A protein has these predicted regions:
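Terminal-region recognition feature
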Residues: 1-233
């Protein structure tokens, strides 16, 4: 167990993340809820009572959330959280819940590389939607530890973007985007068992899958069903 301030000190001291960006991440996470409020939890311990936002409390149990668009702020915080949890215990698994429409590929690659780099297995769970870069991160979870809730949706598609400027600048942008697309398809091929050519074909347009279809495709390993014990309680 560790207090919320301990992570802030780690992120600011070891990862160079500013206090402002930490606050922005907390605000962005809070705004993903319809009431724009982050729930708080009262944590009672011997000789001490503290109040934590629910996401910080869940991180104490090694549960992380990607519940927004992928951008540089979210990427930096998630990378710092992964590295922090590795420093606390390099052998205990980490769970990452994903409900994201995707976003910046470059920033998403930072999260992906950190997931592969840290010692603990990072299990992934889709709740709601994992689209675009969100689908890549879902598939990037540890083998046999990738799952989705029954009514989740997963979507893969080709890289999107625009170009402007001089012809030389546009040529550079095109080559960069082409290289990035190949990296993404190779990552998906690695984690799904599909060929590069199959991924390229299936990603030509928005390719939406239900949870069971995502499992069949190799993006996840399990569809999490309702616990039968709850019905008998």
């Amino acid at each position: 167990m560790f207090p919320k301030d301990e992570f802030r000190k780690y992120a600011m001291g070891h990862q160079g993340i500013s206090s402002l960006n930490l606050d922005r991440f907390e605000n962005a996470t809070a705004q993903s809820f319809t009431n724009s409020l982050t729930p708080y939890v009262i944590e009672e311990r011997q000789m001490n009572v503290s109040v934590l936002d629910v996401f910080s409390r869940l991180m104490m149990d090694r549960i992380l959330f990607l519940g927004t668009d992928v951008n540089y702020q979210v990427s930096n915080i998630l990378q710092a959280q992964l590295l922090f949890l590795e420093s606390v215990d390099p052998k205990r698994d980490i769970q990452m819940f994903i409900n994201s429409p995707g976003g910046s590929v470059i920033d998403g690659m930072g999260i992906y590389d950190t997931m592969q780099y840290v010692s603990p297995d990072v299990g992934t769970i889709c709740t709601g939607m994992a689209a675009s870069m969100g689908a890549v991160l879902l598939a990037a979870g540890a083998a046999k530890k990738r799952s989705a809730l029954p009514h989740s949706r997963v979507m893969i598609h080709q890289l999107s973007g625009g170009m402007r400027g001089t012809f030389s600048d546009m040529e550079i942008s095109y080559n960069f985007s082409k290289q990035l697309r190949e990296e993404l398809y190779n990552i998906l091929a690695k984690h799904t068992g599909k060929t590069f050519e199959q991924i390229e074909k299936d990603s030509d347009r928005d390719n939406w899958m239900r949870a069971k279809e995502a499992k069949k495709y190799g993006l996840i390993d399990e569809v999490l069903e309702r616990n039968a014990g709850k019905d008998n309680a």
